[in-house]
């Protein structure tokens, strides 16, 4: 799989945003991380001050995983299709958060083990479910390529329709197990260091999940460091599509907010598919899954929020969008000392 080269965000716009921050009516650095985020947005948009986001778009990638049949989740596999329907009806957590964050939602069924809910939702569907990664490949070579291309196309479709910020989310029973394998493989971590309690599993289920990750890691070492091979062996169509989506967003110079463990695991692979992509991403939050912190550290991303969330769907990233909007608003709407006629136009006043 080949992606076009990723060019970095605009350094001149970043410098202009940093300089403007230092002239606003506040002590220098007083807005903390909000200042850093506003500079990042300006660099992604190539202008200072940056524009407020007009078309933030959430894409929830859905897929089932064969490993779920091994008792690694607190919920049955058929819940994935039911949750897709719930999001489509507007009744899920992501719907509530998207509404207040002024973002819209698209569901992409890549591998739900059921017929697509609609033609639009299933237009990029690759297959139903995936192989049990503890004992067999998740996908064939052809399915892996199709899933990555699907993610690329979804990113292109959204950017071509005017999306100025993308959020990647996930839904799928068993997907944190596949994500844990990818994170462990790409950070050289032991299974016990990356496996969390996911949907709220008990100790026995955690032990089964850890064993499944261990067995999958034995298989995945045969394909390291090939990113496409990793997705084929121990990913799934949803994770492969997420990787293609995250990489293509960077190729298209469109800022993207990562969500939790599953999306960040896919992003680790995306960075290997299209080096430099990470510059176009922010980590919306840090989840309670232990492997998530390892994945974020590997990408050198500092999470915007830490609210002990572990839901997925894009909820953590969508909550962070409100913070990102605040950062843009402050840089754009605040007056400078000179504009306000306030003393201290050369240097910021003491705090």
Curated annotation (Swiss-Prot):
Enumerate the catalysed reactions. Answer: 5,6-dimethylbenzimidazole + nicotinate beta-D-ribonucleotide = alpha-ribazole 5'-phosphate + nicotinate + H(+)
Query: Which positions are catalytic residues?
Result: 313 (proton acceptor)
| Keywords of this entry | Cobalamin biosynthesis, Glycosyltransferase, Transferase
Q: Which residues form the signal peptide?
A: none
Its annotated pathway?
Nucleoside biosynthesis; alpha-ribazole biosynthesis; alpha-ribazole from 5,6-dimethylbenzimidazole: step 1/2
Q: Name one GO biological process term.
A: cobalamin biosynthetic process
An MF annotation (GO) of this entry:
nicotinate-nucleotide-dimethylbenzimidazole phosphoribosyltransferase activity
Q: Which family does it belong to?
A: Belongs to the CobT family.
Q: What is this protein called?
A: Nicotinate-nucleotide--dimethylbenzimidazole phosphoribosyltransferase
Which organism is this protein's natural source? Mycobacterium leprae (strain TN)
Question: Which taxonomic lineage is given here?
Answer: Bacteria, Bacillati, Actinomycetota, Actinomycetes, Mycobacteriales
